[in-house]
Amino acid sequence: MSHSNPPTGASGGPGSASASAAPARGYYSLKRSIQTAFNDPLDRGLGPPAYQSKVRVMDKYQVIGFISSGTYGRVYKARGRQGQPGEFAIKKFKPDKEGEQITYTGISQSAIREMALCSELRHPNVIRLVETILEDKAIFMVFEYAEHDLLQIIHHHTQQPKHPIPPQTIKSIMFQLLNGCQYLHTNWVLHRDLKPANIMVTSSGEVKVGDLGLARIFWKPVRTLMQGDKVVVTIWYRAPELLMGSHHYTPAVDMWAVGCIFAELLSLRPIFKGEEAKMDNTKKGGSRDMPFQRHQMQKIVDIMGMPTKERWPLLTSMPDYDKLPLLQPPLSASGYSQQPAHSHHHHQHYNQGPQYGGRAGGPTSSSSANSSSAAAAASQSHLDKWYYHTVSQGQTAGPMPHAPPGSLASLGVEGYKLLAGLLEYDPEKRLTAAAALQHNFFSTGDRVSANCFEGCKAEYPHRRVSQEDNDIRTGSVPGTKRSGMPDDSMGRPGKRVKE
């Protein structure tokens, strides 16, 4: 996918009125510190609408409790004061030290990016930034509050007695999620960390894409996207082109993650649950090599089949193409049926021909034919078997002509086609958000509701809020997660392996 046109609505270029209105002030601003810039009354009314100068958090918001913590800070639930109704999530970015004298050295690149993007984005299916406040050298981002997230909803359905998410709920969630993604991509924004924990759901059933800490503008980047952030997207939702070491990528990486989320809504567990290999930090000079994520790629191959240059023409240009022989051929399709799985070949390394990076040639024409046959079998996708086995609750590995109304099987063949379009190996062929929204999946069967809870009998628990640690001003900032809104409090994914 290539993009050569500038973002729609771009303004303020060198020849614009806004660019030439106040040259003196622009020169002055270069000399100011960040602290002075925040407090300077000249900034009032000139920045984004969400910006506030000299406002104290506790004057505007009553903190109800602590939600979660992350690398960059903590998230609190709050209620509005001064005639500002409603509940809010306040994300506090920690200063360099707390409880001691603070040396202000600046703001992290991730925080700046998140503040800049969120202040510009306005869409019903993207979490809304209400305002940003600087107080005592700490930054507070005030977001609209969402009572649920998809991880919490999925977890609720895994509790005994285990019960599937209603199909009309899944359809509404997917439509709203794709709507939010289309808005981001239309505005040249890659999310780069879509997963159930980052998809918020309000009490009224509105689905909102949240946590833009890894988001990035992808229109004409100065450097390859990988140079800025080597590791993007949580491992279970990471697209094949990222796993194969691609240095540049497109919104298709978000769409693969959306496909993984769709599959997880159906099965209540991650479809590709691999383990992440750690970076090698032992190299001289402090360089850090990105390891080939063999285990995660194997999980994809087990269901999707081995990638080939016929299915994915640019496969041979991937940096880790030569690592494909390390992978094993997938289990046979019988693994998704009622018959025993025949997996006697599953523990042999796959090295059957040059199209997979193997050695070309063979001793006889017979062995060559066998090799071609094995390659064809290894590249066959079993996603259809996985889908029908999942939606039929294990009853069949094929379509059900007369699926009971209200059952997952009622999502039918169009559900499979949408899933297959999102989980396409080739990012050029993968469905875009705009194309997915036009898919027959949303125009057949029950109408798509703007409230994903409409007709749903499940009562989902409220978000956990701690009353013991709700001092937004002086609390310490523990935690090791990259982002604090919200953190993945259900403990996933955590296991790593050293390659």
Curated annotation (Swiss-Prot):
<comment type="function">
    <text>Component of the SRB8-11 complex. The SRB8-11 complex is a regulatory module of the Mediator complex which is itself involved in regulation of basal and activated RNA polymerase II-dependent transcription. The SRB8-11 complex may be involved in the transcriptional repression of a subset of genes regulated by Mediator. It may inhibit the association of the Mediator complex with RNA polymerase II to form the holoenzyme complex. The SRB8-11 complex phosphorylates the C-terminal domain (CTD) of the largest subunit of RNA polymerase II.</text>
</comment>
<keyword id="KW-0808">Transferase</keyword>
<dbReference type="GO" id="GO:0060258">
    <property type="term" value="P:negative regulation of filamentous growth"/>
</dbReference>
<dbReference type="InterPro" id="IPR011009">
    <property type="entry name" value="Kinase-like_dom_sf"/>
</dbReference>
<dbReference type="InterPro" id="IPR050108">
    <property type="entry name" value="CDK"/>
</dbReference>
<feature type="region of interest" description="Disordered">
    <location>
        <begin position="1"/>
        <end position="21"/>
    </location>
</feature>
<keyword id="KW-0539">Nucleus</keyword>
<dbReference type="Pfam" id="PF00069">
    <property type="entry name" value="Pkinase"/>
</dbReference>
<dbReference type="GO" id="GO:0016592">
    <property type="term" value="C:mediator complex"/>
</dbReference>
<dbReference type="GO" id="GO:0051094">
    <property type="term" value="P:positive regulation of developmental process"/>
</dbReference>
<comment type="similarity">
    <text>Belongs to the protein kinase superfamily. CMGC Ser/Thr protein kinase family. CDC2/CDKX subfamily.</text>
</comment>
<dbReference type="GO" id="GO:0008353">
    <property type="term" value="F:RNA polymerase II CTD heptapeptide repeat kinase activity"/>
</dbReference>
<dbReference type="GO" id="GO:0046872">
    <property type="term" value="F:metal ion binding"/>
</dbReference>
<feature type="compositionally biased region" description="Basic and acidic residues">
    <location>
        <begin position="463"/>
        <end position="472"/>
    </location>
</feature>
<keyword id="KW-0678">Repressor</keyword>
<keyword id="KW-0460">Magnesium</keyword>
<feature type="compositionally biased region" description="Low complexity">
    <location>
        <begin position="365"/>
        <end position="376"/>
    </location>
</feature>
<feature type="active site" description="Proton acceptor">
    <location>
        <position position="193"/>
    </location>
</feature>
<protein>
    <recommendedName>
        <fullName>Serine/threonine-protein kinase SSN3</fullName>
        <ecNumber>2.7.11.22</ecNumber>
        <ecNumber>2.7.11.23</ecNumber>
    </recommendedName>
</protein>
<keyword id="KW-0067">ATP-binding</keyword>
<keyword id="KW-0723">Serine/threonine-protein kinase</keyword>
<dbReference type="GO" id="GO:0004693">
    <property type="term" value="F:cyclin-dependent protein serine/threonine kinase activity"/>
</dbReference>
<dbReference type="GO" id="GO:0005524">
    <property type="term" value="F:ATP binding"/>
</dbReference>
<keyword id="KW-0418">Kinase</keyword>
<comment type="subunit">
    <text>Component of the SRB8-11 complex, a regulatory module of the Mediator complex.</text>
</comment>
<dbReference type="GO" id="GO:0000122">
    <property type="term" value="P:negative regulation of transcription by RNA polymerase II"/>
</dbReference>
<keyword id="KW-0547">Nucleotide-binding</keyword>
<feature type="binding site">
    <location>
        <begin position="67"/>
        <end position="75"/>
    </location>
    <ligand>
        <name>ATP</name>
    </ligand>
</feature>
<feature type="region of interest" description="Disordered">
    <location>
        <begin position="332"/>
        <end position="376"/>
    </location>
</feature>
<keyword id="KW-0805">Transcription regulation</keyword>
<dbReference type="GO" id="GO:0045944">
    <property type="term" value="P:positive regulation of transcription by RNA polymerase II"/>
</dbReference>
<keyword id="KW-0479">Metal-binding</keyword>
<dbReference type="GO" id="GO:0106310">
    <property type="term" value="F:protein serine kinase activity"/>
</dbReference>
<dbReference type="GO" id="GO:0070481">
    <property type="term" value="P:nuclear-transcribed mRNA catabolic process, non-stop decay"/>
</dbReference>
<keyword id="KW-0804">Transcription</keyword>
<dbReference type="InterPro" id="IPR008271">
    <property type="entry name" value="Ser/Thr_kinase_AS"/>
</dbReference>
<feature type="domain" description="Protein kinase">
    <location>
        <begin position="61"/>
        <end position="442"/>
    </location>
</feature>
<keyword id="KW-0010">Activator</keyword>
<feature type="binding site">
    <location>
        <position position="91"/>
    </location>
    <ligand>
        <name>ATP</name>
    </ligand>
</feature>
<feature type="region of interest" description="Disordered">
    <location>
        <begin position="463"/>
        <end position="499"/>
    </location>
</feature>
<dbReference type="GO" id="GO:1990508">
    <property type="term" value="C:CKM complex"/>
</dbReference>
<dbReference type="InterPro" id="IPR000719">
    <property type="entry name" value="Prot_kinase_dom"/>
</dbReference>
